[in-house]
């Protein structure tokens, strides 16, 4: 069992949350949208509403304590890029980031 931070709960992020739940992993889910967070409460270990581009918010989550951080922000490339960069700066062990733009 791994501890996973999942940021972004759109269609792709929710699917990841469902699969990780089936595999028995501990998942902390984060999104700015309260409805999306509420929709996954039954399938994740914990969930928070917040801005993942805010370094203080990410630091408060304890990103260093997660085995894997997944950035599944698909609608805003800049937010995805900033979040990925912040996670690395804050010492995340492993960062996996979704991009709909080939980089």
Task: For the regions a language model picked out, list residue spans one by one.
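N-terminal Rossmann-fold NAD(P) dinucleotide-binding loop
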Residues: 13
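Aromatic pocket-lining residues of Rossmann-like dinucleotide-binding sites
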Residues: 20
């Amino acid at each position: 069992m791994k501890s996973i931070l999942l940021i972004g709960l759109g269609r792709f992020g929710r699917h990841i949350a469902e699969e990780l739940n089936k595999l028995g992993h501990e998942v902390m889910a984060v999104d700015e949208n309260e409805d999306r967070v509420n929709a996954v409460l039954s399938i994740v270990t914990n969930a928070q509403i917040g801005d993942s581009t805010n370094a203080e918010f990410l630091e408060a989550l304890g990103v260093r304590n997660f085995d894997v951080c997944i950035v599944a922000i698909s609608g805003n490339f800049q937010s995805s890029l900033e979040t990925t960069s912040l996670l690395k700066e804050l010492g995340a062990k492993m960062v996996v980031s979704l991009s709909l733009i080939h980089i």
